């Protein structure tokens, strides 16, 4: 077969295959054009998820009849100066979208230039039969796309169900709307309004916050940390969720480069690294993060749909994003998700009561931190009625007892006012600490809370020096389930030695432990080694040192922490609460689960109809 030039229509159809994959691709290209046209209002209408009809209307600068004719030709644009290709600040710049869409659909464009007397219309069928006529239209542009992919029927077979295609389109519109809070957006499907976003005209931070509330939801903002980070060539702003407010997938992560929505692996990895101390590996944060960077330091022309970018210095960008997110999380480090308390209150409204089960015992706190305002009579009644105690009571004046009560109450009130997590009141099921503040009660998971404290303590210690070791009086022999796990621990013995563990191989499946980290105290060595083996065997020999330290620190923290089922005194409970208040990121354990929930008094009163 001889080599020949392709026809213009064939070239356009090939280009369409790269740029236009589904109705959402059409909506993306046309809405971005409307944004570039300085629109303040953009309306989208769909039928059958865009397969039958897509209409995009805007109030932008519009086009003349001559511009209409040129706009539907390949590689024509008004958006940048070709002499300055490195400074691209618009969504579009290749001049491919309109001719590519026209080549595979029936297109009708109606436009009126601002302050012009007439509107004009151009009609194309499969990219051909171009007809420009005078029309009637308001200022701006309306583009109608009918019978998408009629000219490439094979592509129709690859489209998903209407519901799936519609969801993709809604996602595209939401991303663009997030980046442009000053623009009003509406989206209608088969006559039903799906999205109506009002343009905001306040300061930039307020505009962004309101648009995020409208698109992602008010719950997200309540459970998110604000990011504000700047360098001479770089700025990052937006919101990222508290670790306890997370999802099972990364679908709710919105990332932008110079207001362009991207799905960039570098940024996603940076996000994962920033949260690695706070989230389990199968959970994902929610975020809307906007990176503004000098256009000369980023290449947006590396992907047909411009979904990916290439940075001049990717490591620099990655490290800055990690630092920005960690700084934001640190500022919100003691806060746990508000939705957790709401969910708990909902359960109280509809309790599942088992009438056969006995009421669990609650251990009351009888110390200076108790918030029970007893009378003299009630105190005397709680004292055992034996001869020694009775004789002691007889020697005490009522005035002294009442003074002790007043001192106790005053001390309690000071704690409730001074400390965020309040004063410990009781221990529930020997697992949860109940404390009281001025306007709420706080329920703390003692194991999760102490595990976070231990994790941070061990991690900080490892940054400066090796862990101090304690030699076991009798070396511990740990038998593991298989040889692979024993070999894995032995392969990492030198690294583990720096982390406080001294071990040797003992037979095929056993490890002998002679030294452990002093910080762990009287730890169950068998369980510690088995847990470490489980963690590390999945990675083999190639695990990086930083990742090894992460896994070891997590395992140490788990064995260092107070276990559920251990009774705590009032002093121990209050000491734990005070440590939490002074430790960063104490609102969640390192798997993203909350360490405490707070129930406001007003919400509790509402449960009782007060």
Swiss-Prot record:
GO MF term set: ATP binding; ATP hydrolysis activity; ATP-dependent DNA damage sensor activity; mismatched DNA binding
NCBIfam families membership: mutl, PRK00095.2-2, PRK00095.2-4
PANTHER family xref list: DNA MISMATCH REPAIR PROTEIN MLH, PMS, MUTL (PTHR10073), DNA MISMATCH REPAIR PROTEIN MLH1 (PTHR10073:SF12)
GO biological process, one term: mismatch repair
Gene Ontology CC entries for this record: mismatch repair complex
Top-level taxonomic group: Bacteria
Intrachain disulfide bonds: none
The name this protein goes by in its record: DNA mismatch repair protein MutL
Entries under InterPro entries matching the protein: DNA_mismatch_repair_CS, DNA_mismatch_repair_MutL, DNA_mismatch_S5_2-like, HATPase_C_sf, MutL/Mlh/PMS, MutL/Mlh/Pms-like, MutL_C, MutL_C_dimsub
Primary role: This protein is involved in the repair of mismatches in DNA. It is required for dam-dependent methyl-directed DNA mismatch repair. May act as a 'molecular matchmaker', a protein that promotes the formation of a stable complex between two or more DNA-binding proteins in an ATP-dependent manner without itself being part of a final effector complex.
UniProt KW keywords: DNA damage, DNA repair
Gene3D superfamilies: 3.30.230.10, Histidine kinase-like ATPase, C-terminal domain, MutL, C-terminal domain, dimerisation subdomain, MutL, C-terminal domain, regulatory subdomain
Family statement: Belongs to the DNA mismatch repair MutL/HexB family.
């Amino acid at each position: 077969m001889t080599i020949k030039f392709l026809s213009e229509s064939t070239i356009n159809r090939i280009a369409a295959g790269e740029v236009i994959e589904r109705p959402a691709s059409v909506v993306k290209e046309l809405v971005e054009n409307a944004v570039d046209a300085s629109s303040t209002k953009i309306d989208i209408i769909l039928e059958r998820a865009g397969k039958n009809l897509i209409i995009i209307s805007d109030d932008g600068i519009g086009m003349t009849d001559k511009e209409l004719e040129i706009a539907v030709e390949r590689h024509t644009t008004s958006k940048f100066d070709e002499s300055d290709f490195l400074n691209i600040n618009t969504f579009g710049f290749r001049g491919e979208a309109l001719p590519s869409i026209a080549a595979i659909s029936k297109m009708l464009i109606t436009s009126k230039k601002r302050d012009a007397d007439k509107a004009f219309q151009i009609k194309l069928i499969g990219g051909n039969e171009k007809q420009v006529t005078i029309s009637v239209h308001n200022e701006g542009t309306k583009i109608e796309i009918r019978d998408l992919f009629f000219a490439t029927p094979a592509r129709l077979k690859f489209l998903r169900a209407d519901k799936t295609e519609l969801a993709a389109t809604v996602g595209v519109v939401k991303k663009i709307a997030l980046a442009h809070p000053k623009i009003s957006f509406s989206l209608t499907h088969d006559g039903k309004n799906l999205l109506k976003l009002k343009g905001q005209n306040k300061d930039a931070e307020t505009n962004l916050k309101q648009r995020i509330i409208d698109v992602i939801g008010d719950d997200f903002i309540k459970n998110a940390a604000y990011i504000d980070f700047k360098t001479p060539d770089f700025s990052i702003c937006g919101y990222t969720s508290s670790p306890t407010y997370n999802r099972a997938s990364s679908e709710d992560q919105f990332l932008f480069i110079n207001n362009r929505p991207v799905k960039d692996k570098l940024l996603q990895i940076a996000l994962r690294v920033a949260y690695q101390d706070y989230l389990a590996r199968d959970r994902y944060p929610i975020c809307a993060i906007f990176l503004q960077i000098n256009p000369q330091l980023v290449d947006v022309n590396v992907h047909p749909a411009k979904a990916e970018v290439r940075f001049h210095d990717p490591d620099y960008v990655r490290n800055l994003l990690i630092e920005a997110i960690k700084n934001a999380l640190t500022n919100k480090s003691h806060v746990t998700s508000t939705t957790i308390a709401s969910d708990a209150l909902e359960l109280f409204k509809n309790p599942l009561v088992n009438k056969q089960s006995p009421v669990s015992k609650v251990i009351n706190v009888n110390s200076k931190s108790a918030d029970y305002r007893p009378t003299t009579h009630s105190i005397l009644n709680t004292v055992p009625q034996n001869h020694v105690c009775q004789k002691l009571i007889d020697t005490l004046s009522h005035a002294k007892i009442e003074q002790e009560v007043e001192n106790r109450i005053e001390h309690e009130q000071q704690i409730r006012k001074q400390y965020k997590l309040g004063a410990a009141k009781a221990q529930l099921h020997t697992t949860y600490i109940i404390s009281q503040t001025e306007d709420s009660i706080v329920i703390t998971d003692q194991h999760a809370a102490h595990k976070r404290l231990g994790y941070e303590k061990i991690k900080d210690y490892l940054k400066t020096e090796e862990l101090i070791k304690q030699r076991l009086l009798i070396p511990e022999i740990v038998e593991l389930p298989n040889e692979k796990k024993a070999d894995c621990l032995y392969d990492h013995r030198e690294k583990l030695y720096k982390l406080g563990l001294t071990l040797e191989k003992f037979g095929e499946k056993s490890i002998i432990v002679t030294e452990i980290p002093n910080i762990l105290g009287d730890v169950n060595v068998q369980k510690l080694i088995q847990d470490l083996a489980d963690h590390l065997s999945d990675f083999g020999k190639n695990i990086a040192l930083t990742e090894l330290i992460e896994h070891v620190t997590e395992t140490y923290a788990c064995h260092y922490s107070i276990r559920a089922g251990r009774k705590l005194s009032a002093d121990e409970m209050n000491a734990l609460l005070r440590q939490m208040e002074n430790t960063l990121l104490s609102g969640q354990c390192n798997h993203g689960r909350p360490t405490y929930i707070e129930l406001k008094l007003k919400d509790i009163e509402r449960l009782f109809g007060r």
